[in-house]
Amino acid sequence: MSAPAVEIDAQYRQLREECGLLEHPDFGLLVVDGAEAAEYLQGQLTNDVEAIEPGDGAYAALLDRKGHMQADMRVLRPGEGPELWLLLEPAGLAAASRHLQMYKIGREVEVRDASEERSLISLIGPRAAEIAGSAPLPENACEAVTVGGAECVAVGAAAGIDLVVLADERGRARDALLAAGAAEVSAEAAEILRIESGRPRFGAEMGTETMPAEAGIVEQAVSFTKGCYIGQETVARLHYKGKPNRHLRGLRFSGQAAPGEVLRVGEKEVGTVGSAAVSPALGRVGLAILRREAEPGATVAVGEDGVTAEVVALPFG
């Protein structure tokens, strides 16, 4: 059940002006350790894992051999040792775990699903670093912090700070953050900010038929100077010699819309709604990966109930 509009508006203001706290009970965490951990991931993921220094991180994707995404993730090196953490959306966890377990045979690498051992708490808003007790962190950088006596790893996020904490210390950390001035918000309110920023999410806009170029994540997630990785040929060919057939776009809806609804130009299907929300600032908006026929300025039909949407370039103006 969605929260009432008045409550969502208050949470939205909290996120924009102060700091909202959102827990992620279903987040994914894979721990990759061993002498060959970085070298192994270098050949599996799209970004330059071997260049990640202690306290740093990178955004990356796992592809199949045709260049389609199987998962996206933040790759962190939280300490001085070889251990790397992969923070994943729940939609990509199983595929990433299965793939990395399968291809590590014969290597000095251990891959472990630590999702049940640790919890993820997001602090979103301009006061996030202050409340976390962290210096402002560049996106994907990480550092150890103590919150209410709980040892955490703070990770720079697009809209604030994420805290990775041992599951049995989650409550202590959450209570300390609330006492410091954060306020609990819903996933629905946080989703509005994501949509407004034009950031795609795996399991919403992005899925197993999506290529990085279609989702607009190549600049952040792909290195063209590292060695080979699965799916590299397709990514490089599209980048240097081609154009994607689909692009991530914003949508401004004329009425209520829901994820999964088909989008059409005339009789031609051009995509499906990836996400939709009612923004206090922008109105009814959403994101979708659309075929070239639906360029910015075009109008698309949404579903079967007479709703339409204007296609807009991102970020929203």
Which residue ranges define each predicted feature?
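Acidic, proline/glycine-enriched N-terminal capping motif
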Residues: 1-70, 77-80
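Short amphipathic beta-strand starts and helix->beta connectors
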Residues: 8-17, 60-72, 104-107, 144-153, ...
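Acidic, low-complexity central loop/insert segments
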Residues: 20-22, 29, 74-200
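Residue-level signal for inorganic ion chemistry
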Residues: 34, 86, 123-125, 163, ...
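Short, solvent-exposed amphipathic alpha-helical segments in soluble enzyme
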Residues: 45-50, 91, 100-105, 177-182, ...
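Glycine-rich, small/acidic residue-mixed loop/short-helix segments
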Residues: 73, 210, 215-223, 228-232, ...
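Short, conserved active-site entrance elements at the starts or edges of catalytic domains
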Residues: 193-216, 257
